[in-house]
Amino acid sequence: MGKYRLKSKQKGSVITLMEVDTECQAWYIQADDRNAALQVLKAMSDEIRCLRNIYLNGDDVTEEVCPLLMTIGDASLPEEEFSEMYGAGNPDVGMDMHRTEDSPEGEADSEPVFKLPSIRDVQAAIAAAPPVEDRPALSQTAGISFSSELPSLESVLPASAFQLSASGEKRTDGILLGRSHIKGKISDISTIREEQGGIVVQGTVIDCECRELRENRCLFTMKLADETDGILCKKFFEKKEDAQKLTGVKKNMTVKVRGNVQLDKFTGGLVLNISQMEQGKEKKINHEDMAETPRVELHLHTKMSLDGLIDNEEIIRTAAKWKHPAVAITDHGVIQAFPQIQTLAAKYGQKVIYGMEGYLIDEVPEDIDSDRQQYSHIILLAKNITGLRNLYRLVTLSHLKYYRKRPLLPRPLLEEFRDGLMYGSACVMGEFFRAVLNGDSDEELIRLAKFYDYLEVQPLGNNEFLLYEDKYAAIMTKKDLQELNKKVIEIGEKAGIPVCATSDAHYLFAEYARDRDILLSNWEKPGKIESHPPVYLRTTEEMLEEFSYLPKEKAEEIVITNTRRVAEQCEVIEPLAEEWKSYNPKIAGADDKLKAMCYEKAVELYGEPLPEIIRDRLDLELTPIINHGYGVLYYIAHKLVKHSNDRGYLVGSRGSVGSSFVATLAGITEVNPLPPHYVCPHCHWNQFFTDGSVGGGFDLADKKCPNCGTELNKDGHNIPFAVFLGFDGDKVPDIDLNFSSGDDQAVAHKYTEELFGRDNVFRAGTIAGIQDKTAFGFVKRYAENRGLTFNDIFIEKLSAGVAGVKRTTGQHPAGIMVCPRDMDIHNFTPLQYAANKRWLKDETGEKIPGTITTHFDYHSISGRMLKLDILGHDDPKVIRMLQDITGIDPLHIPFNDEKTLSLFSSPDALGITSEQLKAAVGDKGITVGAIGLPEFGTPFVRGMLEDTRPKNFSELVRISGFSHGTNVWLNNARDLITSGKVKQEQAISTRDDIRI
């Protein structure tokens, strides 16, 4: 790497040769006068012919400076000049007249092709050449003088211009593999049908990985897809260190690749063997709304509509970018996008109108299960918080009481809960547009129109399918479609009701149309291909163009003026209660009862007066627990556990609740988080070990009380309270409890209804989207119906377009959401049946009511409502069974039994040898006896036991910490422990170990 300052005496301008990259044969130049710099460089063309690239002020000027510039890997020089420079007269450079490096074996090119010097040849030539400032040709030709001091490249170009190469050198050229930029025409991947050499393709990285092989080799594989097809790309590296240069290749990145296409013996298909790779130019969809006064979209569907594809963040970001004063969210029959939309609206500063496209039926049906219900679409928009709560109530009623294949809304119900809501006439499926389509009289149309706050018209493409419907024989041309919209506008004027132009957007941009075709193909009948309307979000200009058949003033009125007026009537509201406030249920005297039971239990265990360490820990925990309103949560957990204990079942606590001493004293967990200690159950003599010399209380040796001779209890696992509720004790407690699976879990669920009231307890709802494998099947069905053939990589690319769209709803297996008695559930969420199944069948086949869940996914409201995790688990059930069989109390089993502990390092206590175990198992862990022990029986954990040979309970706890999480043990703690650098107790096994 060399740096020089070059001055042109003739022009008086200064050009700075910022860097000479000897690896890439590139010059990076900064100049005040670009034109003068170009003249100087052109005068130097003979001397700089060996360079690959020349960058001037960040631009590649290679071709401009020297059109015949030779670059490694590309024989661009005329044959005579190339031969003179690098031919037979040069003993260091060979020539191959028959084939290029990229040509397949046995094939000859029609024209002689010269083999170019290797990069090492060029590097050696540069190294052997005299310094640039000593070359007379430069000063004689261009009148250039040199000085060695100049500013660094970093001081001239922004940091974003640099890419770190594998060798640690900064590069600005985007080259990922190879020595130069890729030249040549880019081919569509779909054109690759046979083996060929030197092909160039560009596409999106669908997935990539670098797999280590034997003998330090490495195989890089990449799934690449463009807009036509996909192909697997490979690159072998003799040294895995050389593969580091491709660590910058990531999923969804755009890359350009050159290589040879060959039939791969492993995959059986064509594979592109990579010779060069660089970052490609991503084809971004970049639509803009340039209108001075933009419109408002009042009809839009997110992925929560079964047929919608609009991503929540994409629509809010786009609306903000387009400076739309508001955007409405109106999914089909649901409002499940609201929680995330609220967060995104705050993030982007975008006003959102919260609404829904409902299914209107004329009257309350006598038989809701009738298949003959005629429904119409209707838009509901919330104007204020009252309207929002009424919208929630309508959603609940439509899902719980009036659900028949879809959530229906009887007209009387809409009248009852109209306060705070605006009703729009919706699309071609709305009752008003249907009446227009059917040719109803003006009087009837005006009567229908007066039910709505505004009428809708949409682009002709949305309704173009009417041209092909036999039952609408009168609709034959686009002009007929225009007349339908004109009729809506006419009736709106007569009735004094504003008319608004809406997109009925189901996908964001026109380029996403194929994604929706793929999504809807799942409902196509085999062999029947359906076309779908272009229901994408229009810009203001596009919408005005859609209604250009109207007078300009009228088009602007329905597209801009009226939509903005509707938006102005809707306040800025938040669908959920304030994010920072948690509404916990109230139980009279819960705080006092919790405090009293804790001190009572502490005195029972440790005597009175309480030791200072006990008093301090109780004060540390009880103060923030009560001050932050969490006392009731502890008390509820205490009641649930006690109810199960009284029935003879143990309850297992999960997660970090064991770090709370208050939870221990309240009987919520049997884990004691105090420092390891002895305590006498008779006279309360105690001894605490706070110097870290003991890993846990269960590791202490058996000992009798020095005061009274009673066998001492041993306890304490030294867990800080901050692990559970944070350093300030302000984290919402997450108390997960394992109840005995089967009867006891069901009883615990029933007991919550007794505690809080049946009408205040609901199962936590979940929302399931289309998963990758299902989306893959959608694409295959789409292709098969159309007689298309896609390879798996291209299918994987297309499936990403439909993945994540809502598929169904469900319930958390253990989550219970509790609404305070003095609050309405509709302050938080609507309700529905899980998977919309109003009726289920029990084991006998009898019909039983379905499970009522929250309409919103429980994650979005768990910080606002109390969520109880009442899990069913086999362990408490098995422990109870063993207690019944043996008569041994599980709470009095010793944790330092020598034979039991020996199982984690040897099978001898089982009465079998390692050889017998090896014959039976035949894999790792043959020298330990843990194969039948839960959490320790897998080959991975048995291998850990062989490496560590744990000797006590606290070491077993650390093993469990090491075995959970990515790279906690492998490539981390294992290497440190087996190399002897640290002892097991010194390695980080859990977050508790990371303390200052």
Which residues does each PLM region occupy?
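Single-stranded nucleic-acid-binding OB-fold domains
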Residues: 118-122, 126, 136-290, 308-309, ...
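Helix-hairpin-helix
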Residues: 299, 650-662, 938
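Extended low-complexity intrinsically disordered regions
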Residues: 579-626
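Helix-rich "cap/lid" substructures immediately adjacent to catalytic or cofactor-binding pockets
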Residues: 608-652
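Catalytic DNA-binding helix-loop module of base-excision-repair DNA glycosylases/AP lyases
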Residues: 642-645, 656-668
